[in-house]
Swiss-Prot record:
Signal peptide (from-to): none
Function recorded in the entry: Peptide chain release factor 2 directs the termination of translation in response to the peptide chain termination codons UGA and UAA.
Origin superkingdom: Bacteria
Residues found modified as N5-methylglutamine: Q252
Full protein name: Peptide chain release factor 2
């Protein structure tokens, strides 16, 4: 890397750091962290375990924000030192390589920090519950459902998030009929709420002996995992419970007893299932948690509708309702119809490279809130 290019890159990194610092009161943040940690050492802190965990989580969020910012400033200082070293010995290949690597990492971390600053909605920091439901399109659609399931799993793993399968139903011939996963990690819901909606797929179907082009649709729903501090009233009389034998994806490790639980909320028609726990009681408890999350989300959507704020609304599976198109034939493209962000590398996207789409969505939402 040429020194002049490195200096330009460093100037850009420092400009971003200065912009971040303008919205960050580091002294106040440090005091808030100290206050949380003092509370954690008080007698009786663990008397209410749920409340204690909430305090710890909030403190971790603040510490993560502080440490991420300080890491950026340290990286900028190290890059400045490397530039000076390379200026003294321009032929030092090792220093040049280290400088290029340090700049690339700092640029990546600046982008990640910037992305986190866009997560301002309630429950953005929460874990995410993500559901995949193939729509019209038959076997082609269920196969695309499996591709989306894999895409989100890959994305989560690349970010160090934990993925738990809550419910999985394999398709008759290929793919999946439906799947529900929990993605555990800081800001998982904030990142993935961009994925809620109908995804459209166009390709030459491997299941069509005539080699014709097919269009399929898959609906994705995303909701935050709510903790017990959120009160949602659910009457026992409104719930119908069914039990079934649960097992792994594709029917592996099927239990000989019915531990899987399916709950139907009759007033709304909402159906949730859980097979993640080992006991029927555990699955009922977790299914109830999912139901409350869905009911809470439903109420939020009603409030948004009343304010005519319908962005992010999940629409009916079918023509014209998609939020994103994945085209593999006659050309290669993935395009988000809300932000107009697109790429001609669909395989990278299907392998989990969703961050550019997530970033574009969050920037788009910010522009809707602040049109000027």
């Amino acid at each position: 890397m040429e020194i002049i290019d490195a200096k330009h890159a460093l100037a850009d990194i420092q400009e971003n750091i200065a912009r971040f610092q303008g919205t960050l009161d580091l002294e106040a943040l440090t005091e808030e962290i100290a206050d949380f940690e003092n509370r954690m050492t008080e007698p009786g802190f663990w008397d209410d375990n749920t409340k204690a965990q909430k305090v710890i989580e909030e403190n971790n969020v603040l510490k993560n924000r502080r440490d991420s910012f300080l890491n950026l400033t340290n990286q900028a200082e190290e890059i400045e030192v490397l530039i000076d070293m390379l200026a003294e010995d321009p032929g030092d290949v090792d220093t040049a390589t280290e400088l290029a690597d340090s700049i690339a990492q700092a640029q990546k971390d600046v982008e990640a920090y910037n992305l986190e600053q866009l997560l301002t909605e309630p429950y953005d920091a929460n874990n995410a519950i993500l559901e995949v439901h193939p729509g019209s399109g038959g076997t082609e659609s269920t196969d695309w459902g499996a591709n989306l399931y894999r895409m989100y799993t890959r994305w989560a793993q690349q970010h160090g998030f934990q993925v738990d399968v809550l419910d999985y139903h394999a398709g008759d011939e290929a793919g999946i009929d439906s799947a529900t996963i929990k993605i555990t990690g800081h800001n998982a819901f904030g990142f993935l709420r961009s994925e809620k909606g109908v995804h459209r797929f166009v390709r030459i179907s491997p299941f069509d002996s005539a080699g014709r082009r097919h269009t399929s649709f898959v609906s994705v729903d995303v909701m935050p995992e709510l903790d017990d501090t959120i009160e949602v009233e659910v009457r026992d009389d409104d719930i119908k419970m069914d039990v079934f034998r649960s097992g792994g994806a594709g029917g592996q490790n099927v239990n000989k007893v019915s531990t899987g639980v399916r709950l139907t909320h009759e007033p709304t028609g909402i159906v949730v299932s859980s097979t993640v726990e080992r006991t029927q009681y555990g699955n009922r408890d977790y299914a109830m948690k999912l139901l409350k999350s869905k009911l809470y989300q439903l109420e939020l959507e009603k409030q948004e509708a009343e304010r005519a704020a319908l962005t992010g609304e999940k629409m009916e599976n079918g023509w014209g309702s998609q939020i994103r198109s994945y085209v593999l034939h006659p050309y290669q493209m993935v395009k988000d119809h809300r932000t107009n962000y697109e790429t001609n590398q669909p395989q990278q996207v299907l392998d989990g490279d969703l961050d550019p789409f997530i970033n574009a969505y969050l920037q788009w939402q910010l522009s809707l809130k602040n049109p000027n």
